[in-house]
Every structure is written in C-alpha cells, then in structure tokens.
Amino acid sequence: MGMTIIDVEESMIPQLAALEEQCFSMPWTEQQLRSQLPDASHEFIAAVDGGRVLGYVGMMFVLDEGYISNVAVSPECRRQGIGDALIAEMDSRAKRRALSFATLEVRESNAPAIALYSKHGYVPVGTRKNYYDLPRENAILMTKFFTDKEDMHCEDTIL
C-alpha cells in the first residue's frame, strides 16, 4: 500500500497511545486522547499505511489561533517524510480555518524536530524555562504566521 493522511478515528486511539509511549517521557494516555477527539476545538490527523498508524499530529483551536499539541512519528518510520507530510497537511487545514498563526513547543535538544518545524516556516519566538520533565528541559516556543504582518495591523503590537 502507501501512506495516506486521514482524520483520526476512535479505533486508532490505542495506536496513538502506543506512539505516545514510544516517543515521549510523559505520554498522553488513551483516556486523554479519547477525551480530545470529539471536541470541535481539536483536530487530529494520522499518517496510516494498511491500517497501521505511522504518526499523527493534533491541533487545538482558539478563535483564530492554533496550538499544535501533539506530533509523534513511530521511531522506525522517522526520516521518511511522514512528519513533513503531517505538518504540511495540518498547516493546510489551519489556513482553511483562516487561522492567523499556530504555535508549538519543542524540547531544546530535539534538533530534528526543530529543523522540521523550521522547514515549514515555524520560527522561535521564546523559551519556556523548565517546561519539560523527565528530563527537566526548556522548551522552544515556535510560531508560524499564516497572514502577512501588514494584514494583521500589529506593527504596534509586541509579539
């Protein structure tokens, strides 16, 4: 078969939770994932191949802002364009929703993820000190703007 990107379905939750376990020191549980899925202020997409979830992204929406809450790709599937395709698709959906911008946090030490987000136009805008546990580490806050700054009329706004 081949990889396709689809909306996450309830039946995929156990696979998403397993990915969380593989990828993060403080993973979301099945219950946490399940509670977000039916919420209209969240959107989850997955890269799948033959029913197997290879990776997924979750985004939360507040007014015209997006927050990428989850990005996970199976360790054995990394460096194959899956994260790239997922971020591109979520950015496309953010634009269709007319979002002004999207933000995310990433561990300072996660150079591959930082490079991926940078490739897609996310730029560092700040640091969250001691944001992560296990191990304790700062997060880099990254943002992508989907509108021109002139359109936002924010020349007098401190970002």
Where are these regions (language model features)?
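Conserved phosphate-binding and hydrolysis motifs of nucleotide-dependent enzymes
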Residues: E9, G51, G55, G81-G83, ...
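Acetyl-CoA-dependent GNAT
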Residues: T4-E76, I87-E89, R93, R97, ...
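Conserved catalytic-core motifs of GNAT/GCN5-like acyltransferases
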Residues: Q31, E105, S118, V123-I140
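Residue-level recognition of the GNAT/N-acetyltransferase active site
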Residues: E9, S74, R78, R107-S109, ...
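Conserved acetyl-CoA-binding loop-helix of GNAT-fold acetyltransferases
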Residues: R79-S92, A115-K119
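C-terminal "cap" of GNAT-fold acetyltransferases
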Residues: S100, R107-A111, N130-L159
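Short coil/turn segments at alpha/beta junctions that flank glycine-rich nucleotide-binding fingerprints
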Residues: Q80, R97-S100
